[in-house]
Amino acid sequence: MKWCKQPKIASNLQMPTITQSQLTFESGSKPIRIDAYIPGSNGTSLPAVIALHGAGGDVAGTEKFAAQLAEQGFAVYVLHYFDRTDTQSADKPTILRNFPVWMKTLWDAISFVEKQPAVDRERIALLGFSLGAYLSLANSTIDGRVKAVVEFFGGLPREMRLFMRRLCPTLILHGEADATVPVAEAYNLQQLLEQKSIPYEIKIYPGAGHGFESEVWRDAGQRALHFLQKYLAAS
């Protein structure tokens, strides 16, 4: 997965000081790491974004993106959901076996994040990459605490459509030439959101595969930021 170095919004505002720490919570009696990136807020509750890595298990790129979002005023939490199953990286059989467990881990992570003193519990979004996008979308169909989802080259598991209680505003970002998660997943999700009259935005990048080159990342980063600012705005 390739990451751009600076996918951030040009601004005349001074960037806030970011406090970074690694916290833990319990899920299934196991300690789960969650990396927090908290901007200074003068005591004001902040919108929160929980970020989920992909099947490779490498959080480095996710953490870079988290730090950039925190610079824009979001409390961002990078979830090490593989801790629940002692997974390093996940192939298809591993994903099928553990997906429900990771779903519960994400549910517990939201419960943990909404109790954090810096967080406005009414303004929580999920942001996921690949497998993390699948988990984010699946959770959003049953968890009313999630107000928005940004999904990079993922999709909604077909099984979740049978148990779907809700959907929320969703940003779909996908490569047209994705050979890992076919772009049909993006269009299927778009169709479902339209059928349910749920606000969404979609950008399909011509020629892009699973993971983006720098120029695409810059555009995707801008879109993600604008979407989160729109749907996590203070009421």
Language model feature labels by segment:
Residues 176-179, 207-209:
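Acidic beta-to-alpha connecting loop that harbors the catalytic carboxylate
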Residues 106-167:
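Primarily recognizes the serine-hydrolase "nucleophile elbow" in alpha/beta-hydrolase
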Residues 180-185:
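Conserved alpha/beta-hydrolase "acid-adjacent" motif
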Residues 1-36:
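A domain-start/cap signature at the N-terminus of enzymes
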Residues 22-38, 45-115, 217:
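Serine-hydrolase catalytic machinery in alpha/beta-hydrolase-like enzymes
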Residues 166, 172-174, 178:
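Short beta-strand/loop motif that positions the catalytic acidic residue
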Residues 53-57, 130, 176:
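Active-site glycine-rich loops that stabilize anionic/oxyanionic intermediates
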Residues 187, 196-235:
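C-terminal catalytic histidine-bearing segment of alpha/beta-hydrolase fold enzymes
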